[in-house]
Regions:
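Signature of N6-adenine DNA methyltransferases within the class I
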Residues: 1-52, 66, 115-264
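Coupling/switch/interface segments within P-loop NTPase motor domains and analogous charged loops
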Residues: 37-132
Length: 264
């Protein structure tokens, strides 16, 4: 806000109405159905069209058009109607593919089952040569109870959750999964920063996450904090680390850490 106050001619803040959402952001699938390709073109150049494929492309074009209108809409009421229209198109597309999921009582933009990253943020993931977010910031939950079904899904989605004999141990702690997710949704050269439990630095269960970041991030910075002389969060007796990294196609060229800031 101070930057805006100091500006001679401050520009209007972006409309965040359509960007504030909730959901199970670790999953972009539901009951085994992949929901990440709702906006992708089904037919490539030179491929033959079937009626089924052409109908899917119609739904996906309608969805992309509605999303473009949704992003540009300044009116709250109209935006809510567009959100409903988008949800209806998603449901129609699934039915067209023979996928019958009962979404009747489920809000596709706010539910505890999944989150449609590539639909609601189509503008972010469709940028040429820059597919993904510039910045990801998180204070993820940790120690959550995970069903056996979700565990199997996470092991398929996140490389850091996979245990590979003699190479790495995988972790299914939610904070580790969120760091992996943050890495996935960044574009190359994008930056992420998370505040998470201190165990991210030393637990052998984090070796899968360490391997992912070291092999695919240019720079990694870690600052660690104890709970004395003062807690980072007054209401939580938790030692934490702040980890930031820059996504890359190369191995890490710089890893910087602090000694744990702790005093008895």
């Amino acid at each position: 806000l101070s930057l805006i106050v100091d500006e001679k001619s401050p520009e209007a803040l972006p409309n965040l109405d359509f960007k504030i959402m909730q959901g199970n952001s670790l999953l972009e699938q539901y009951k085994g159905v992949d929901l990440s390709t709702m906006t992708e073109k089904k037919i490539g150049a030179g491929e033959s069209l079937t009626f089924f494929d052409s109908m899917l492309d119609v739904y996906r074009k309608n969805l992309r058009d509605k999303l473009t209108e949704y992003y540009a809409c300044p009116e709250h009421d109209k935006k809510m109607q567009l959100r409903k229209d988008i949800a209806d198109i998603v449901k129609q597309e699934l039915v067209e593919q023979g996928i019958h999921i009962d979404f009747e009582d489920m809000d596709l933009s706010a539910n505890s089952q999944f989150f449609l990253w590539h639909t609601w943020f189509h503008d972010v993931f469709s940028r040429p040569s820059k597919e993904g977010f510039d910045i990801v910031i998180g204070n993820p939950p940790y120690g959550a109870k995970i069903s056996s079904i979700d565990k199997a899904c996470f092991k398929h989605i996140f490389t850091s959750a996979q245990t590979i004999p003699n190479i790495q141990k995988g972790s299914l702690d939610t904070f580790s999964l969120f760091i992996d997710l943050g890495y996935q949704i960044l574009h190359t050269k994008g930056n992420a920063i998370f505040i998470v439990p201190l165990s991210v630095t030393a637990s052998d269960a984090m070796s899968g996450l360490h391997r992912l970041l070291i092999n695919h991030c240019d720079e990694i910075y870690v600052s660690s904090y104890g709970d004395r002389p003062r807690r980072i969060f007054e209401s939580a007796e938790q030692q934490v680390s702040i980890i930031s990294f820059k996504k890359s196609s190369n191995k890490a060229t710089r890893i910087m850490t602090t000694h744990i800031n702790k005093r008895y």
